Amino acid sequence: MRPQHEPVVTQRAVRVECIPDGRPADLPAGTPAKITQALGGSFTLWVEGQLMRLRGADADAIGKRIPSIDLAPTAPTDSGLNGVRSLVWQTLKTCYDPEIPVDIVELGLVYVCDVLPMDGGQFRVTIQMTLTAPGCGMGESIADEVCDKVLALPQVGEAHVDIVFDPPWDRSMMSEGAMLTLGL
């Protein structure tokens, strides 16, 4: 049984990214679409047989409010290294591949997440992550989203995300919860 997808119509012209190649496209006002995924602050749309990613900042283009990602209920009280490390990992769990309804941590895409103190009480975050397929055109977009969300944390002064392919990703890297969600 296929999940129900919410039909929408663009209310203004908007820039989107085509999935899976990541190329930009412009949707004119009045374009019918279906929301197939609304996770991590962005939307995946089905438009005329093509999946497209709409940034959360452009949610008004489909009549939606800009999604907010609230980490406050689970934010650690420890403002030191361990607390910031925990907050960074929580933030990574708000990042999704636009084709898969499981976050990048549960998918096993994050290989390294180093959090190091800097002068002035802030932290430098270095992340090495992979993609489910080496040819995925959305890699840069996903990495940019990861970097932007981590940099939005007030404790983080610098963030860098590298896409790596060694070791190559495979399904065994997913959490049990991810496998259950995907029916594997």
Regions from the PLM with identified roles:
Residues 1-184:
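Domain-level signature for proteins that mediate thiol-based redox and metal-cofactor handling
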